[in-house]
């Protein structure tokens, strides 16, 4: 609530939706979700978007002394996150960068996580997925799923046009199927 301006990284709608959910923001937040207009629309080079969002944020903060702004960034498959809180108000107190991250890493390492198998077999369901496209259209699906016992796995779909069409036009989350290995890779076959 102390943040006056927000710029959520916006490479895809899902990146904005995930950030909104994690920050408990509503799509009609009166502060807006971007100070630039969003990555596809701001008029600058895409590979320097966050630099531009920070620069735009600084202009807003300098025009409204004492306010705060949040700019976020992410990369890869939304697995690398960055966030910055900015203000024209000087920092008060002593700032120290953490030099020993051992305790933090130990806490992360001890968090409960599912077992993982590289050779899944049997009935399974989709936990999350994406569709890889080529110039000709959908090429294959990538599935992160769970076996019946909760073990997590990674698999591809076959290059079956009907499966890919189904994946493009339906929500595959929690879809049941069967997963097996063909010796080179894991294959998930949904039950449609």
Go through the PLM ranges and name each one.
Residues 1-2, 26, 162-166:
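Phosphate/pyrophosphate-binding loops at sites that engage ATP/ADP/AMP, CoA/4′-phosphopantetheine
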Residues 14-18, 40-192:
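Conserved beta-strand-centric core segments of catalytic alpha/beta enzyme folds
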Residues 12, 26-29, 160-161:
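Alpha-helix initiation/capping motif
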Residues 17-39:
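Flexible glycine/proline-rich, aromatic-decorated loop/lid segments
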Residues 1-10, 29-37, 64-74:
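Beta-strand segments within the central parallel beta-sheet cores of soluble alpha/beta enzyme folds
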């Amino acid at each position: 609530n102390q943040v006056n301006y927000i710029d959520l990284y916006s490479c895809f709608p899902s990146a904005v939706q995930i950030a909104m959910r994690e920050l408990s923001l509503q799509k009609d937040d009166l502060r807006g979700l971007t100070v630039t207009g969003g990555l596809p629309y701001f008029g600058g080079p895409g590979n320097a978007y966050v630099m531009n969002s920070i620069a735009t944020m600084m202009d807003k903060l300098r025009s409204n002394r004492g306010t705060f702004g949040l700019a976020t960034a992410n990369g890869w498959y939304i697995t690398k996150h960055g966030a910055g809180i900015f203000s024209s108000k000087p920092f008060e107190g002593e700032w120290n960068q953490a030099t020993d991250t051992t305790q933090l890493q130990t806490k992360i390492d001890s968090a409960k996580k599912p077992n993982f198998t590289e050779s899944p077999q049997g009935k399974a369901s989709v936990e999350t997925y994406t569709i890889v496209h080529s110039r000709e259209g959908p090429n294959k699906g990538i599935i992160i799923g769970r076996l019946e016992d909760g073990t997590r796995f990674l698999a591809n779909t076959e290059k079956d046009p009907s499966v890919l069409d189904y994946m493009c036009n339906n929500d595959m989350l929690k879809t049941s199927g069967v997963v097996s290995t063909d010796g080179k890779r894991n294959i998930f076959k949904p039950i449609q």
